[in-house]
Swiss-Prot record:
Annotated source species: Paracoccus denitrificans (strain Pd 1222)
PROSITE patterns found in the cross-reference section: ARGE_DAPE_CPG2_2
Function: Catalyzes the hydrolysis of N-succinyl-L,L-diaminopimelic acid (SDAP), forming succinate and LL-2,6-diaminopimelate (DAP), an intermediate involved in the bacterial biosynthesis of lysine and meso-diaminopimelic acid, an essential component of bacterial cell walls.
Keyword Oxidoreductase applies: no
Protein name: Succinyl-diaminopimelate desuccinylase
Amino acid sequence: MTPIPDPAQLTARLIRCASVTPDEGGALVLLADVLGAAGFECHRVDREGVPNLFARWGAQGARTFGFNGHTDVVPPGDPASWTHPPFSGHEAEGWIWGRGATDMKSGVAAFAAAAIGFVTQTPPPDGAVILAITGDEEGPGKHGTRALLDWMAARGERMDVCIVGEPSNPDRMGEMIKIGRRGSMTLQIEAHGIQGHAAYPHRARNPIHALLRLLHELTDAPLDEGTEHFDPSGLQVTTVDCGNPASNVIPERARAVINIRFNDAHTAESLDRMIRARAAAISAETKVDFAISTDVSGESFLTAPGPFVDLVAGVVREETGLDPVLSTSGGTSDARFVKDHCPVLEFGLVGHFMHQVDERVPADQVRQLARIYRRILERYFA
């Protein structure tokens, strides 16, 4: 009989793999060994030097439950600032210490342990379980989960539903399930005027004035009032610069960067179109030209409340005694890629210490998460 790994101990072992993006650090090798010993078919899916792991138990094409997570971590900073070395996986007084303890080697370990326990039971379940684990979530994200999903599609692999194991709970285990995320886009806006002497503004065209007018229009009123499942969209000016050290010179150019986190009342295209139209109107009046470039991290998405959401929420409620809030708050995650393939939710640990010096997680919380994942699998395939 295949032994079921202790998810807390597996978390500590994964932490000892120094997998700072883009280095794999041995974490995916360890995970493949653990899953392979339990009968999972494992494939390394590396693209452009980015390491990823696909693992499936059960027949291709069967009803399939998926899990998406990452083993890469952010840099630890100065190791001397840590109580215990950041890649020690130190275990003491019920805590596991190290970079990735919260985000999110613990989530990966919890699901791996839950899945191994589930698929090795007697009789074996009727269905398939997939783990799609990337080494590029904390970095650019272009060749991580995207590459896994492309690889799966090319080979006829699919997931019918998926959980992303990001730390979803703000303060207490079981208080929140992410059923969607806002979209995110960044716009670089450059205003081109005519340089001149500050004493003779009629001989110049001040790009700062035109740019400030555009920024005022964009920030003077909210983009919306929110929707049924989303808070109001937010637009933030994150950079304003003209690179001009002289107080008596009107600069030729001025630049701003804005970031928009938008709900399902908008698309990136509709927001981009609105901003360009406002810039064009100001340009026509001021004769200052605008050049705008747009980078879209992801569109907003929602997994509407229904059978899958109800199943996960019911298990969380039974295990924790809390009625989880169905939320779309926070930043982006790799769920923005998965949502194009199947319904996706995010549920994981409490995110108190993620990305901090002395990142750590209670060992019992990791074991509780594994129990929740195991019960979700059992309920899904019942």
